[in-house]
Amino acid sequence: MTNFQLISDNLKEEKIEFEILWIGQSELFYKGIESTLIDKYWQFLLLNDGSLTKQLQLLKNKKIKRKLLEESPINFTTSFISYLTQPIKIPIIQRNIFLYSNEVEPLIYATSWWSENTINSFFLDKEQPIWSNLAQLKIEFYRDLRKILLINSKSLEKQFNKKGPFWSRYYLIWYNNFPITIIFEIFSPIIKV
């Protein structure tokens, strides 16, 4: 079972089921992706190393808010925990959130996995998105993009109030040569409007 398959199976447990239409591997990101596969707008958002929160704020001209859906210790399959503990130390906390520019339609659905031992040192204000917290700490970090996906999801069509397909990405954030979190983000098409 692939690492991404483990993440996908875990999200099904969270009632976020999806069908994968296309997967871009990391070697594609450095060569460049043809605009026939992904238009330049989505390439900019998906491949950018900067703060997604700040990019959304500029695009929407509104403050980006986070809605915490759930934060809890994970209790999943041995293979999923085994995959997570390769980069992230146990015990592991899973966070599910939406990012909004208003209270009506979410822009992003995200799931992240953190070591319980480090999560509080990176979240000065848990009401703010991850990138706002990391910026407040004034630390250098690296986003290690692993995959870009195009997916269909009936459950997210309801949440986003938009028809799919949806772009998504999965990456690790590194700090001081150690991975601090794994993040999976799914983008609403409303971002481009």
Curated annotation (Swiss-Prot):
The organism's place on the tree of life at top rank: Eukaryota
Major location (coarse): plastid
KW Acetylation (keyword) present: no
Pfam families xrefs: Rv2949c-like
Keywords, alphabetical: Cyanelle, Plastid
CC terms in the record's Gene Ontology section: cyanelle
Residues passing through the membrane, by range: none
SUPFAM superfamilies tied to this protein: Chorismate lyase-like (SSF64288)
Compartments, as annotated in UniProt: Plastid, Cyanelle
Keyword Plastid: yes
Family statement: Belongs to the ycf21 family.
Record's protein name: Uncharacterized protein ycf21
Source species of the chain: Cyanophora paradoxa
Taxonomic lineage of the native organism: Eukaryota, Glaucocystophyceae, Cyanophoraceae, Cyanophora
